[in-house]
């Protein structure tokens, strides 16, 4: 964490460059690699720390407080080492056998499929929104398995860089620096050992668990994946808060006879409200992850009720973070609108992150309410 803290000012200074490039600068990715961040969720057998997931998300929060796009990509790329740990040992050797620093991008939206063939699958598709794909040597792509013309499973296909192309299409209003371009796969054979069923992850029968037995790898996918999306947004809220307080401390309000913003009692109220909500968002998000992890460390299972609570609070944390950024942005004055200012960038980045499917509040709230009534839940993202 000390090495990461030392890097934050540099990431903050590069935030505009990151946005202009529409991808994370190579120097930033190299520096993050050197801090050991990407090894946090990597198995010990491959030189990783297989760490407490709260430590990982705390690091993500810090990175995102300096640069939203860098935090977003770091979170997503970083969690893929956790996902790869659940694949077969052979798949892990394929990726990490020669280089344990290899990075993996993803797109889990079913924008392609795999046709069953002898020894594996023939995969075709165009997967949008693969954040950080320019910095990855492999991709994990979600989609159905098709057999006899019918979908029989939903899986992740693990595919090396030489077997797909990247279409540079990412030109957007928020999270511009994430390089979330489209991964295109055409008639690529993927062997069986490089395919992992989401069902196997959910019921803890993933083949990687035979060797990677640390508690972190038994965390529910329905907690890990959504938290990976929300943690950087909460980090952006912390960054927006710091930027707002600094801005208000210097701001003179032209419309109020030169009154200093820091002397405005209403400005102080908004700061207090936003600060409280941001802290509440983080406490809920990290607290549920900590509770689940503590149970697994103790050798116990994570009850379904806790998994539902984690999803409920994860979308609530995202909502709280974004509402707080809105409150701060609305009271920052016209100077905060200028291109290059951090507050407007955090505002755009957080709202862009909000549209991710994992942040759909109604879906998570309906699941929680359904569970409270003791009714069956069919949603798999829990």
Curated annotation (Swiss-Prot):
GO terms for biological process: fatty acid beta-oxidation using acyl-CoA dehydrogenase; steroid biosynthetic process. Pathway: Lipid metabolism; steroid biosynthesis. GO terms for molecular function: 3-hydroxy-9,10-secoandrosta-1,3,5(10)-triene-9,17-dione monooxygenase activity; acyl-CoA dehydrogenase activity; flavin adenine dinucleotide binding. Keywords: Aromatic hydrocarbons catabolism, Flavoprotein, FMN, Lipid degradation, Lipid metabolism, Monooxygenase, Oxidoreductase, Steroid metabolism. It comes from the Bacteria. GO terms for cellular component: cytoplasm. InterPro entries: Acyl-CoA_dehydrogenase, Acyl-CoA_DH_C, Acyl-CoA_Oxase/DH_mid-dom_sf, AcylCo_DH-like_C, AcylCoA_DH/ox_N, AcylCoA_DH/ox_N_sf, AcylCoA_DH/oxidase_NM_dom_sf, HsaA. Pfam families: Acyl-CoA_dh_2, Acyl-CoA_dh_N. It catalyses: 3-hydroxy-9,10-secoandrosta-1,3,5(10)-triene-9,17-dione + FMNH2 + O2 = 3,4-dihydroxy-9,10-secoandrosta-1,3,5(10)-triene-9,17-dione + FMN + H2O + H(+). Its EC number is 1.14.14.12. FMN binds at residues 72, 106-108, 129-131, 251, 334-335, 356-357. Homotetramer. HsaAB monooxygenase consists of an oxygenase component HsaA and a reductase component HsaB. Catalyzes the o-hydroxylation of 3-hydroxy-9,10-secoandrosta-1,3,5(10)-triene-9,17-dione (3-HSA) to 3,4-dihydroxy-9,10-secoandrosta-1,3,5(10)-triene-9,17-dione (3,4-DHSA) in the catabolism of cholesterol. NCBIfam families: monooxsub_HsaA (NF045629). Belongs to the HpaH/HsaA monooxygenase family. PANTHER family: FLAVIN-DEPENDENT MONOOXYGENASE, OXYGENASE SUBUNIT HSAA, MEDIUM-CHAIN SPECIFIC ACYL-COA DEHYDROGENASE, MITOCHONDRIAL-RELATED. This is Flavin-dependent monooxygenase, oxygenase subunit HsaA.
